[in-house]
């Protein structure tokens, strides 16, 4: 064996069992039994042995609001690794007038040889011409089997219902999954412009201009369109009770509907946008955070298996230099917040609080993402033959989240001051230790592009 991990407690979505495991050639080669000599033995006494986290919603090196986000693939993926995530699926954005394959080539140039962990792409379809819709048929051959469209941001990302129907229909026939940002963009634009005309320009009006009904209306419409063409659909960052109700109604009708939520919607509320000294701008992301009641709805949905995953929606806009552009007009605040490093630690607090079980935690942050997005069982579990993407987790370790302890390129954490119990200590990527007792020891060439299998209904 190359590495033996001894005395740990293996936790998968299916169960919990104390067992030693052996790693050979980047794969889990043996669980339990007697082991021969190894190049290295790691003592995992008192620690859980989790599969590496999988974050299927990140925006790295994204360009919006006439600027580029702070994190590069190098910094974002080191942060992810230190938080216990060993694979991300990033949003690769098509440029208008260009093909989807050109977008892939652009992202390859940004990520190739510069990623500390494994990575894949969803493609954001911004310019859905006839030729682009036809491209959906060939992208699965490149290992890209998911696409994202927006029902918001007219003039930037927003597509109409006919285009959404065509995209859903074509993707379903080619084994791909369409991910939808569900907000009624026209309603949101109308409300935000009305607020500004009335002199209401503070960050809180970002949330007030995108109320739950704006999200729920688009969610209901997207689900209905998927139903019309009998296509699977994945609603990204579901935030509120009204949208959840629409999801449940669609499921009851037999719609093949999946949905995620994100860490920020479990812990932050719209009240955070009213923090003094323009601090509320840090919490301007879309959809906006909601209420404590909505948080309870989301936690219950996670516990009951209705929501598929918890992602980060990591998008690294600095407070100074990005967010502060909107001091006089909330519409100029770049939408998004960091979170790829904090995700596992924050979701794990749900275990401590009795909201979800230990196995459900693994299901939400690793196993289900791998299954939905075509990476299981190579990733997302601890099993013989799987990639040795492993996190040794100390359930008793405590910390207070501070940006100074994070590994990204940011100047704040969305979860600054949160008290945490349970942290990743050692992280392995395909059998290589990349985080050793909290210290990053990997290299920017460790990560590999991950081809994903077609989606199966």
Curated annotation (Swiss-Prot):
GO cellular component: cytosol
Post-translational modification Phosphoserine, affected residues: 69
Cofactor(s) the protein requires to work: Zn(2+)
Binding site for Zn(2+) 1: 57, 59, 148, 313
Residues engaged in binding Zn(2+) 2: 148, 181, 237
Signal peptide: none
Keyword Metal-binding tagged: yes
Coiled-coil intervals, chain numbering: none
Cofactor binding note from Swiss-Prot or TrEMBL: Binds 2 Zn(2+) ions per subunit.
Keywords: Hydrolase, Metal-binding, Phosphoprotein, Zinc
GO molecular function: hydrolase activity, acting on carbon-nitrogen (but not peptide) bonds, in cyclic amides; metal ion binding
Entries under InterPro entries matching the protein: Amidohydro-rel, Hydantoinase/dihydroPyrase, Metal-dep_hydrolase_composite, Metal_Hydrolase, Metallo-dep_Hydrolases_sf, Urease_alpha_N_dom
Class of this enzyme: hydrolase
Highest taxon, organism lineage: Bacteria
Binding site for substrate: 153, 286, 335
Modified residues (N6-carboxylysine): 148
EC number: 3.5.2.-
PTM comment text: Carboxylation allows a single lysine to coordinate two zinc ions.
Family: Belongs to the metallo-dependent hydrolases superfamily. Hydantoinase/dihydropyrimidinase family.
Function text: Catalyzes the stereospecific hydrolysis of the cyclic amide bond of D-hydantoin derivatives.
Subunit structure: Homotetramer.
Name of the featured protein: D-hydantoinase
């Amino acid at each position: 064996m190359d590495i033996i991990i001894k005395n740990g407690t293996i936790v998968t979505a299916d169960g919990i069992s104390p067992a030693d495991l052996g790693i050979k050639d980047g794969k889990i080669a043996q669980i339990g039994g007697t082991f021969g000599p190894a190049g290295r033995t790691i003592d995992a006494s008192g620690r859980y042995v989790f599969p590496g986290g999988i974050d299927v919603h990140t925006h790295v090196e994204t360009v919006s609001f006439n600027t580029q986000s702070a994190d590069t693939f190098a910094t974002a993926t080191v942060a992810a690794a230190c938080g216990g995530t060993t694979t991300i699926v990033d949003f690769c954005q098509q440029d208008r007038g260009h093909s989807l394959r050109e977008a892939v080539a652009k992202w390859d140039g940004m990520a190739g040889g510069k990623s500390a962990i494994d990575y894949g792409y969803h493609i954001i379809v911004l310019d859905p011409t006839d030729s682009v819709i036809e491209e959906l048929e060939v992208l699965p051959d490149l290992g890209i089997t998911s696409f994202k469209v927006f029902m918001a941001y007219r003039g930037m990302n927003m597509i109409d219902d006919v285009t959404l129907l065509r995209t859903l229909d074509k993707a379903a026939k080619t084994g791909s999954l369409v991910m939808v940002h569900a907000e009624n963009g026209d309603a949101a634009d109308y409300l935000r412009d009305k607020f500004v005309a009335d002199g209401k320009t503070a960050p809180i009006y970002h949330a007030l201009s995108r109320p739950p009904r704006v999200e729920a209306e688009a969610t209901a419409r997207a689900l209905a369109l998927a139903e019309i063409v009998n296509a699977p659909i994945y609603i990204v960052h579901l935030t509120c009770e009204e949208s959840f109700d629409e999801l449940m109604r669609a499921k009851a009708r037999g719609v093949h509907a999946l949905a995620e939520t994100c860490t920020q919607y479990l812990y932050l509320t719209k009240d955070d946008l009213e923090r003094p000294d323009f601090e509320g701008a840090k919490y301007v992301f879309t959809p906006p955070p909601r209420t404590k009641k909505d948080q309870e709805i989301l936690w219950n949905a996670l516990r009951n298996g209705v929501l598929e995953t918890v992602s980060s929606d990591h998008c690294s806009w600095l407070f100074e230099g990005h967010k502060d552009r909107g001091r006089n007009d909330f519409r100029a605040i770049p939408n998004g917040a960091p979170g790829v490093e904090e995700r596992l630690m924050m979701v794990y607090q749900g275990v401590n609080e009795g909201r979800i079980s230990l196995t459900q935690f693994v299901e939400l942050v690793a196993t289900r993402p791998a299954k939905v997005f075509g990476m299981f069982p190579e990733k997302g579990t601890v099993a013989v033959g799987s990639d040795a993407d492993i996190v040794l987790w100390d359930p008793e370790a405590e910390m207070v989240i501070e940006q100074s302890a994070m590994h990204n390129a940011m100047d704040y954490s969305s979860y600054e001051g949160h008290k945490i119990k349970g942290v990743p200590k050692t992280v392995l990527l395909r059998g290589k230790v990349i985080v050793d007792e909290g210290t990053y020891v990997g290299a920017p060439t460790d990560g590999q592009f991950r081809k994903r299998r077609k989606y199966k209904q």
